A protein has these predicted regions:
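Stable alpha-helical elements in mature extracytoplasmic
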Residues: 26, 30-37, 91, 95-98, ...
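Short, conserved phosphate/pyrophosphate- and ester-handling motifs at nucleotide-, phospho-/glycolipid
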Residues: 179
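A short acidic, glycine-rich active-site loop
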Residues: 23-29, 76-88
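C-terminal alpha-helix
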Residues: 189-197
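A structural motif corresponding to the C-terminal end of an alpha-helix
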Residues: 36-48, 90-111
């Protein structure tokens, strides 16, 4: 697994007040860094690599709080901010182009895209069926304040910030990261998506046996 790389670079830029268009100018450089890091890992002898993409950041409490608006058209059917998710799609599209180039440059290695974006959207869209609280899907478990239980100046870890009673019923832990239960289910989706693409005989035979 190479990364995830770039998420904190974008987070920092957004928190410095840069616009989406300004942050988009960073994406080619970030993707090139990921590509070079992957090539370096290949140089160390790796033959099967997973390179993960970006989450749909417009679905996360931290961004829903920072960019909250009364404009209903800014949100999609899952109540995610469309412009921010489009930013993630832009990053992921460039990353998949870079992975295609890596495959051409290293035909003897298997390089697979880790689709964090669609894994999380699956989790969010099926959350009520998976045992999560449907009234708190975009509220932080560890947080305080606002519609998303996330305070821009009161973060998880502050003695004044409470924790929800049952984290296993929440997707978001602290507004930025997921709960262990959410990560577990997302990982299950990713494994099922990635394993067939890794071209590993043991994995194929094991998958067909379970």
């Amino acid at each position: 697994m190479v990364g995830e790389i770039g998420g904190n670079d974008y987070n920092y830029a957004f928190w410095q007040g840069k616009t989406i268009e300004e942050v988009k100018t960073m994406v080619p450089e970030v993707v090139e860094t990921i590509k070079q890091a992957t090539k370096r890992v290949i140089g160390y002898g790796a033959t099967r690599l997973v390179v993960p993409g970006n989450f749909p950041i417009g679905c996360f409490p931290v961004y829903l709080t920072k960019y909250q608006t009364n404009d209903a058209t800014a949100y999609d059917e899952l109540h995610c901010l469309k412009e921010l998710n489009n930013f993630s799609i832009y990053h992921n599209d460039l990353l998949q182009q870079a992975i295609a180039e890596l495959k051409e440059e290293h035909p003897d290695e298997t390089v697979v895209y880790g689709d964090y974006y669609n894994a999380f959207l699956w989790l969010l869209s099926k959350a009520d069926l998976l045992g999560f609280d449907p009234t708190s899907l975009q509220k932080a478990c560890c947080g305080i304040g606002g519609d998303y239980n996330y305070g821009l100046s009161s973060w998880c870890g502050d003695p004044k910030v409470p924790v929800c009673e049952n984290p296993n019923e929440r997707l978001s832990w602290d507004g930025v990261h997921l709960t262990q239960r959410a990560y577990e289910l997302m990982a299950t989706w990713l494994v099922r998506d990635i394993y067939p693409k890794l071209q590993c005989e043991y994995i194929v035979s094991y998958s067909s046996a379970v």
